[in-house]
């Protein structure tokens, strides 16, 4: 005859599945000691005696439903740790941001305090640079003006020299010609164009100062050379009875000779 051992009732499932498996094994089921020690005729009443009353079972189920599983407890703990760390990080971040803001304010205050000094230095430096540039520009303008003035002076000097040289060439040639004409001998010879030119020039320059000789002296070959002009000419004749007629005839002959020479020159 086999003994029918009472099966323990299975525990109700937890309300929430565990997030992770617990490392500790579950407790063994509660078995009454009366099952092993009770006689065979009392076995039919053993499972009634060993099972707790319904009120106790309901209370145990309520307690189990109230107590969260181990996985939920672990997740709650990890969430609490994460939230605490996040709060701590936020606090540190806010403190660091506040400290950085304070440092920025201090730096701005220092820069504002030192900005007038540096701005004054910068303004003086810029003004010095502008003055140097102005001085350099004025010096360049002066040098350019001097260069232009020197160039104009050189050009004018060269032009004046050129004009003087041209005038001197023309004037020198004329002067030389005049000197040569003055130095040429004058004669009463009625032969050749050179004699006519010389006589014309002589009558132009020495008008009113020429003393002509009588016809006998004018025709003689001895007096055909150079005549001295400027003083009274003494004419020696064979006879001392020279009359006004002879002088008049000589003057008329000289005038006719001059007219002929002028017409030939034209």
From Swiss-Prot:
Keyword Aminoacyl-tRNA synthetase: no
Ranges annotated as biased composition (Pro residues): 9-30
UniProt feature, compositional bias: Polar residues: 77-93
Molecular functions (GO terms): kinase inhibitor activity
Parts forming coiled coils: none
Keywords attached to this entry: Brassinosteroid signaling pathway, Lipid metabolism
Low complexity: compositionally biased ranges: 31-40, 210-221, 229-241
GO biological process: brassinosteroid mediated signaling pathway; lipid metabolic process
Region feature Disordered, mapped onto this chain: 1-144, 167-242
Biased composition regions of type Basic and acidic residues, renumbered to the chain: 100-109
InterPro entries: BKI1/MAKR1/3/4
The keyword Mitochondrion belongs to this UniProt entry's keyword annotation: no
Top-level division of the source organism's lineage: Eukaryota
GO (cellular component) term, any one: plasma membrane
Biological function: Negative regulator of brassinosteroid signaling.
PANTHER family: BRI1 KINASE INHIBITOR 1, MEMBRANE-ASSOCIATED KINASE REGULATOR 4-RELATED
Listed name of the protein: Probable BRI1 kinase inhibitor 1
Organism lineage string: Eukaryota, Viridiplantae, Streptophyta, Embryophyta, Tracheophyta
């Amino acid at each position: 005859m086999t003994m029918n051992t009472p099966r323990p009732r299975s525990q109700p499932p937890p309300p929430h599945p565990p997030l992770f498996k617990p490392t500790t094994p579950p407790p063994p089921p509660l078995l009454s000691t009366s099952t092993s020690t009770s006689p065979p005729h009392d076995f039919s009443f053993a499972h009634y005696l060993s099972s707790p009353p319904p009120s106790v079972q309901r209370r145990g189920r309520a307690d189990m439903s109230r107590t969260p599983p181990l996985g939920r407890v672990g997740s709650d703990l990890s969430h609490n740790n994460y939230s605490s760390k996040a709060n701590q990080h936020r606090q540190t971040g806010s403190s660091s941001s506040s400290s950085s803001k304070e440092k920025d304010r201090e730096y701005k205050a220092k820069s504002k305090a030192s900005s007038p000094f540096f701005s004054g230095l910068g303004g003086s430096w810029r003004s010095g640079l502008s003055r140097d540039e102005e001085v350099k520009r004025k010096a360049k303008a002066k040098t350019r003006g001097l260069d232009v003035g020197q160039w104009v002076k050189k050009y004018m000097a060269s032009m004046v020299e050129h004009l003087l040289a041209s005038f001197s060439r023309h004037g020198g040639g004329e002067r030389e010609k005049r000197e040569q004409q003055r130095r040429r001998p004058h004669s009463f010879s009625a032969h050749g164009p050179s004699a006519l030119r010389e006589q014309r020039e002589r009558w132009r320059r020495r008008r009113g100062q020429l003393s002509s000789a009588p016809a006998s002296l004018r025709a003689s070959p001895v007096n055909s050379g150079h005549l001295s002009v400027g003083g009274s000419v003494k004419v020696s004749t064979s006879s001392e009875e020279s009359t006004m007629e002879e002088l008049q005839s000589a003057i008329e002959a000289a005038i006719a000779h001059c007219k002929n020479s002028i017409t030939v020159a034209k």
